[in-house]
Amino acid sequence: MTQQSIADRADRLWCRLRLDRLAGGRQADYVIREDMLAHPATVRSFRRIRWLLVAETVVGLAAIVVAILLTRAGETIPWAVWFRATVVLLITLTLYVFAWRAQLGYYWAYQRLRLFSRIFPIVTLIIAAIPGLYPFWMVIEQIVFSVLMIGIGDVLTSDHMRSAFPKPAKREAP
């Protein structure tokens, strides 16, 4: 089974379950033009986003591994560290879904990814600044996570990506 056939099957299942409607609301059916989706700059942008998400996954997994190793060495790891490490991985999984749907041209997914790439770094850095909440290594992990998210936001707000994903026209009320 090829990677493309797996992607096609996943897309068909996603559409059959009407998850775009659930996640995208009234803009669920709005898809950008095919020529903009296939544009080399769009393809390049999504390749960068995928690599940044892979890096975020590595950072999240590294945080869990460090916590496990420190626990095995006899250190007490605060619950906030375990919670944060788990949440980072779950957030990253949702970002993969948004990136996948945006790469297929769904405006709602592009907007969600863009929104989260703005909000998560701010929240993460504010929480990292709370004295004593996390050990130093976890504060560094949060800073790295934020920098990666800012990178995703930077790619998504480039002139090309904003022109590739124009806002949908307002619908007339019935």
Give residue ranges: language-model regions:
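Topology signature of small-to-medium multi-pass alpha-helical membrane proteins
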Residues: 2-174
